[in-house]
């Protein structure tokens, strides 16, 4: 069933809004994957805050105009599934990477992060990016480390003095 002009405009507006708010995107060829597996992929994506869209490439190219994913338009060919990360940089890549381990028919074509388009070989690396909470945790640990070391150093001096005095006392009592 062909889409009417109004339906096409609605699809373009919807994808454009998602793309404008997304942190990263993954385009993967889904040819040969059954409906049940695609439904499972959509469920996994929803749980991770990833939006999946299957749209015609011409509509996707129009939707990407003026967004950071505009550079993907030139390389989009074939039936593509678009996954958009809405919560952190690597969530879409994680969902697609994990799903493609078990389903070889899902073949990654493009990965876009921050307006830069990467090939499929970068999917695993992008999927290993920390989540927002993990990044904050790493940052806080890094900021906390110098203070912790300073406190440990400051506590070491009085502790050493107490041990020295105790050793002198034990030596005098033994003599």
Curated annotation (Swiss-Prot):
Transmembrane segments: none annotated. Belongs to the universal ribosomal protein uL10 family. The keyword rRNA-binding applies. GO terms for biological process: translation. Forms part of the ribosomal stalk, playing a central role in the interaction of the ribosome with GTP-bound translation factors. Keywords: Ribonucleoprotein, Ribosomal protein, RNA-binding, rRNA-binding. Part of the ribosomal stalk of the 50S ribosomal subunit. The N-terminus interacts with L11 and the large rRNA to form the base of the stalk. The C-terminus forms an elongated spine to which L12 dimers bind in a sequential fashion forming a multimeric L10(L12)X complex. InterPro entries: Ribosomal_uL10, Ribosomal_uL10-like_sf, Ribosomal_uL10_bac, Ribosomal_uL10_bac_type. This is Large ribosomal subunit protein uL10. It holds the Pfam family Ribosomal_L10. One of its GO terms (cellular component) is ribonucleoprotein complex. One of its GO terms (molecular function) is large ribosomal subunit rRNA binding. It comes from the Bacteria. It comes from Psychrobacter arcticus (strain DSM 17307 / VKM B-2377 / 273-4).
């Amino acid at each position: 069933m062909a889409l009417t002009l109004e339906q096409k405009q609605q699809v373009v507006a919807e994808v454009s809004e998602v793309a404008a708010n997304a942190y990263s995107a993954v385009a993967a060829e889904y040819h040969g994957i059954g409906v049940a597996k695609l439904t499972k992929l959509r469920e996994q994506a929803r749980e991770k805050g990833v939006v999946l869209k299957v749209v015609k490439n011409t509509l996707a190219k129009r939707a990407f105009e003026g967004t950071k994913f505009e550079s993907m338009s030139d390389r989009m060919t074939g039936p593509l599934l678009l996954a958009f990360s809405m919560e952190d940089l690597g969530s879409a890549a994680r969902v697609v990477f994990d799903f493609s381990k078990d389903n070889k028919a899902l073949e990654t074509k493009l990965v876009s992060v921050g307006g830069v388009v990467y090939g499929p070989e970068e999917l695993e690396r992008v999927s290993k990016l920390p989540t927002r909470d993990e990044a904050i945790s790493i940052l806080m640990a890094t900021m906390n480390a110098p203070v912790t070391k300073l406190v440990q150093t400051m506590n070491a001096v009085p502790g050493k003095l107490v041990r020295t005095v105790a050793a002198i006392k034990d030596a005098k009592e033994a003599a």
